[in-house]
Regions:
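A secondary-structure micro-motif
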Residues: 1-78
Length: 78
C-alpha cells in the first residue's frame, strides 16, 4: 500500500529508509520529490497488515535511528 506525506524539510531522508509505527517497522520510503517551492512529498510502501491501524488523521515525522543513524519516518496517532 502506498502512503504519502508532505514535509517542509526531509533532513537527509533517502529512498529505502525505514517507516515505523508504534515502534514497529511497517515499510520503507519509496520515492521523494518536490511538489512546489517549499514542500517535499515522501511516498512510502506500507505493509498491508499495518494499514488498518493508520488513520487518516495520523501524523508523520522524520527522526533518526540512534544518535547518528539513518533517517526514518515515524507515523504516530490516528
Amino acid at each position: 500500500i502506498h502512503v504519502n506525506a508532505l514535509f517542509d524539510n526531509v533532513g537527509g531522508l533517502k529512498v529505502g529508509n525505514n517507516v515505523w509505527f508504534s515502534g514497529v517497522k511497517i515499510g520503507t520510503v519509496r520515492r521523494i520529490h518536490f511538489v512546489n517551492n517549499s514542500q517535499v512529498e515522501v511516498e512510502m510502501n506500507i505493509q498491508e497488515s499495518a494499514t488498518e491501524f493508520i488513520r487518516k488523521d495520523a501524523t508523520a515525522s522524520i527522526s533518526s535511528e540512534g544518535f547518528i543513524g539513518n533517517k526514518l519516518v515515524v507515523i504516530a496517532g490516528g
